[in-house]
Amino acid sequence: MEEKVLVTGGAGYIGSHTVLELLEAGYSPVVIDNFHNSIRGEDSMPESLRRVQELTGRSVEFEEMDILDQAALQHLFKKHNFKAVIHFAGLKAVGESVQKPLDYYRVNLTGTIQLLEIMRAMGVKSLVFSSSATVYGKPVPASGRGPPHRGCTKPYGKSKFFIEEMIQDLCRADTAWNAVLLRYFIPIGAHRSARIGEDPQGIPNNLMPYVSQVAIGRREALNVFGDDYATEDGTGVRDYIHVVDLAKGHIAALKKLKEQCGCRIYNLGTGTGYSVLQMVQAMEKASGKKIPYKVVARREGDVAACYANPSLAHEELGWTAALGLDRMCEDLWRWQKQNPSGLGAHG
């Protein structure tokens, strides 16, 4: 019998790639999503998951649901015998969180508390949580062996930090709980089929979707926020990870839960940092297009460099990021070329 796993927020970028990996690994995912970060396709199915079904030849059980809808969540848990939960659902734009802090705390914190309460009531005490490198605040590099930096500056990062603390407290209070908290660095790229990928609504918040939209002609030029950092070329250095590697990390995390692991925290990154200009050059190479850019003022709160120490994930999960920068950019460009309007243009 295939294990049923609840995936909250499973129609988004990382979620849809993880659902595909779950299916390929023999799990039976049940996905809930409220379409905040996803496109509605045919039959009220998220377009991303419709394409996952097409790629795998398997059906995905999906319910439109908001993480804040306690009654609907309770009903869902009564209907299914879940063995574990992978929790992606939440608001995720760092900049927007500064403008709308209460929204971020309500959705991310209250939504998670309600989910944990229902899990506890139903005896489902295995969780993989989608955390973020933003919990580190401003260390360079983020080591992952020590505690997070308490200098999270934005409500988004704080919400992830508070949830991590909450889950750790829960695991300490009740040893029947097992949780793996995955701190993501920056996912880029797309599935090699180019059928699913990152489809930001409106102006992309992240560097590489913006760069790829410049390459295909949807946007005029890239703004580079500062070229006077203490880095090799003066631009900010970050750790970029292929979304497929990141998705595979969740499969490794589910296996870890079976070991009665308590609460474990891992960085999912490559351990290598690339600057903004290095990323532009890599995308120019992959696309064969010149990517115009202009240097503008630094963004408040940006750090010079942030990259992962993923050694603990390698040691304890047997997980390593396998796909390099060239492959990330090639897959991203293929996705952008074949889906110039994103998932909105069904096909």
UniProtKB/Swiss-Prot annotation:
Family: Belongs to the NAD(P)-dependent epimerase/dehydratase family.
InterPro entries: NAD(P)-bd_dom, NAD(P)-bd_dom_sf, UDP_G4E
Pathway(s) this gene product operates in, as recorded in its UniProt entry: Carbohydrate metabolism; galactose metabolism
GO biological process: galactose catabolic process; galactose catabolic process via UDP-galactose, Leloir pathway; galactose metabolic process
The protein's Enzyme Commission number: 5.1.3.2, 5.1.3.7
UniProt key word Glycosyltransferase: no
Residues bound to substrate: 132-134, 184-186, 205-207, 223-225, 238, 299-302
UniProt-listed Gene3D superfamilies: NAD(P)-binding Rossmann-like Domain, UDP-galactose 4-epimerase, domain 1
Catalysis: reaction(s): UDP-alpha-D-glucose = UDP-alpha-D-galactose; UDP-N-acetyl-alpha-D-glucosamine = UDP-N-acetyl-alpha-D-galactosamine
GO CC entries: cytosol
The UniProt record lists the keyword Nucleotide-binding: no
Transmembrane residue ranges: none
Active site location: Y156 (proton acceptor)
Cofactors that this protein relies on: NAD(+)
Record-listed NAD(+) binding positions: G12, Y13, I14, D33, N34, F35, H36, N37, D66, I67, F88, K92, K160, Y184
Keywords assigned by UniProt, alphabetized: Carbohydrate metabolism, Galactose metabolism, Isomerase, NAD
Top-level taxon: Eukaryota
Gene that this sequence comes from: Gale
UniProt GO MF annotations: identical protein binding; protein homodimerization activity; UDP-glucose 4-epimerase activity; UDP-N-acetylglucosamine 4-epimerase activity
Protein's name according to its UniProt entry: UDP-glucose 4-epimerase
